[in-house]
Amino acid sequence: VGDKAINFNRRDLIATMGAAAAGHALIADSVSHANNPAANVDDRHSTIKITGMRATWVNPNVFLRIETNHGIIGWGDLKGVDPRVSKPLAESLFELINGENPTRIEHLWQKIFRAHRDIRGGPFLIHTLAAIDMALWDIAGKLWGVPVYRLLGGPTRDRIRVYHTKQAVKIPAAPEEHSGTPAAIDAIVERIKDARKKVGPTGAVMFDAHSAIPPATLIQLASALKPYDLLFIEEPAVPGNIEVFKRLKQHISIPLAAGERDRTIYEMLPYLLHRCLDILQPDCCHTGGITSMKKIATLAEAFFVPLAPHCTASNLGIAASLHVTASIPFFLIHEFYPENGGFNPKGIMRMEWKVDADGYVGLPNGPGLGIDVDEKKLEEEGKKPQTYRWPGRTLKDGSIADY
């Protein structure tokens, strides 16, 4: 072409191109247009970094406070394991997230989960990871000024069904040792019969076996409980042997629920593949946090299995679990004990939960988790001596039992 100037306008250029190339040009033109919001997205929070973390032990929980260079902090609830181990573990894991962008939540979850091949998936790591993950979601929600459930896809319901309401009745536990005799089974049946009478024909009756009843005995018991229309039998067996759960499902017609002692999608998947649970009960503080619980819900959805989340956390953990629950389609009922002092230890949190006349609680507030922590009170309580004793159950003959 030599010295000649080539003066093609965009229309002339597109006219000389093939259809596919023309399409690409038009798309590029649209994307680059100054008035297209999608073409001008600026991540205003790309400069935010994690700068510090404080772990405070107030029985029975360890509370994590994750700090950022923007002055926004996030809170996490670490529970269910020995605080004498989990607190220093959290402080050790901080080196993996220090200086990172807290909104890279999935990336940081994977970084911690995969960091050490020999403790990957173990309860101490996963419970600690759950608290860190919870705090990161709290930060993200506060950054964008929205409740966490908005970041999880938005609400799928207007309110959340819970148990432990004003109408709820908790029947005292049965004897710790189950002989399997007809008399022992009859004693438990009488308790369930009494519960059904108190809540009426439309109330929900649930039986928690707490992994403490031998399979053969539970099969007999479940048969005797059929007339009382149980919503589910919880924790029918100790996790770890899927064959036991398969046997129970084969012989028990009442829906079976479990999952509070299982962690991440990897431990939940066998229940679904073998079709031996009707309801999954992940605990947000046990299973890897908000990130993990959301994945479990999606996994269960593919099998049309609803969640009935286990939750014996502080108000922080309750809020985290409710945020996930607000965003998932397959849901049954949520464990809920906010009036118990153990869920607001020493009164360090400010959060009001209002249960309506039908037994539902409203969607959790925001921004973030929506929980206010009295840091002065937390610091005061954290300076006091804290104690912990390993739980356990011993039978009358001195042997050790599951519980």
Question: What kind of feature is each model-predicted range?
Answer:
Residues 8-26:
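N-terminal export leaders
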Residues 369-403:
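Extended hydrophobic packing segments that form well-structured cores
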Residues 69-146, 402:
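Metal- or metallocofactor-binding catalytic centers and their adjacent structured scaffolds
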Residues 91-95, 100, 107, 223, ...:
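Shared catalytic-loop signature of beta/alpha-barrel
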Residues 1-8:
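N-terminal secretory signal peptides
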Residues 27-60, 66, 73:
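C-terminal segment of N-terminal export signals and the immediately downstream linker at the start
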